[in-house]
Structures are given as structure tokens and as C-alpha cells.
Regions:
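Contiguous, amphipathic alpha-helical segments that mediate oligomerization or scaffolding
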Residues: 2-49, 106-140
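Extended alpha-helical coiled-coil "stalk/arm" regions
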Residues: 28-92
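Amphipathic protein-protein interaction modules
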Residues: 76-121
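Short, charged, intrinsically disordered terminal tails
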Residues: 142-146
Length: 146
């Protein structure tokens, strides 16, 4: 017969898992920043000696974000299956960043950042599950408290 795990043990385990995932997301955020800092476009954007025209080409007018290769992968529009213009799917984004025949869009640093972003998406889903587990344990604790 399976023995029930004490509530206190379940709560501590859930809290530790939640904290581990939060720290992992924070580390991934730093990794993304480090990879993007190595992108040639980002390095050019941080150069104070660039011309006004180059500066205009490097920054997005609407958001003010640097138009890194990763920015291009997330914002480039392609023709959708129904004829309209849509953003690229994950496969198209990966091809955009790794195309060996296109030096304009290929960037190993932006691709590394993109990979971490995809992994972070999975960790955030785990974090959501960890939050739901904590909530469930909290409700259970309220029921057993006098």
C-alpha cells in the first residue's frame, strides 16, 4: 500500500521547485542578454560614432528596440497559407537565423539567444504548473487547519 507523503514535505518540495524554476528563468534572461550583446548589430548600435542614417536603420521607429537578427526573426512577415501576411512560425524563425546562404539574417549569437528563449518558454510552463501546485497545497492546508 502506498504511504501518503506528509503535507509539510509536499509544501517544502513544491516551494523548492518553484524557487528553482524562478532562478532558472532569471539565469536564462541573463544568457539571452549576453548572447544578444555579442550580435554585430547590437555592437554597432552601442557605437557612439555611427551616423544618423545608420542609427535610423538600426532602431525600430515604433518601439526603439535595436533591430537585431533576432528582432527580424520575430517581426518579419511572410505570406500565410490563406494569402495574408503573418509572422514566421518557429521553423521559419530558426531557418531565418541559421540560413547558411544569407549573411544578412544569419547570426550565431541571435540564434543562441533564440534557442534559450525557446527553452525558457518550456521552463515558464513548468513554473506555471509549480504555481498551480502551490495554490492547490495552500487550499489543502486551509482545509486541514482548525
Amino acid at each position: 500500500m502506498k504511504q501518503a507523503i506528509p503535507l509539510e514535505t509536499r509544501v517544502i518540495t513544491a516551494l523548492a521547485n518553484h524557487e528553482r524554476l524562478l532562478q532558472q528563468v532569471g539565469q536564462m534572461k541573463k544568457q539571452i542578454g549576453a548572447h544578444l550583446a555579442e550580435c554585430p548589430v547590437m555592437k554597432k548600435a552601442n557605437d557612439w560614432s555611427i551616423s544618423a542614417q545608420d542609427s535610423k536603420d538600426i532602431y525600430d521607429e515604433k518601439t526603439g528596440l535595436v533591430k537585431t537578427h533576432l528582432w527580424g526573426a520575430f517581426n518579419e512577415l511572410v505570406e500565410g497559407s490563406h494569402g495574408g501576411m503573418v509572422r514566421m512560425n518557429l521553423d521559419d524563425q530558426e531557418n531565418y537565423l541559421t540560413d547558411p546562404w544569407c549573411d544578412e539574417t544569419r547570426c550565431d549569437h541571435c540564434y543562441a539567444a533564440w534557442r534559450v528563449i525557446q527553452d525558457r518558454r518550456d521552463v515558464r510552463q513548468e513554473l506555471g504548473q509549480a504555481r498551480r501546485t502551490l495554490r492547490m497545497l495552500g487550499k489543502l492546508a486551509l482545509r486541514v487547519m482548525p
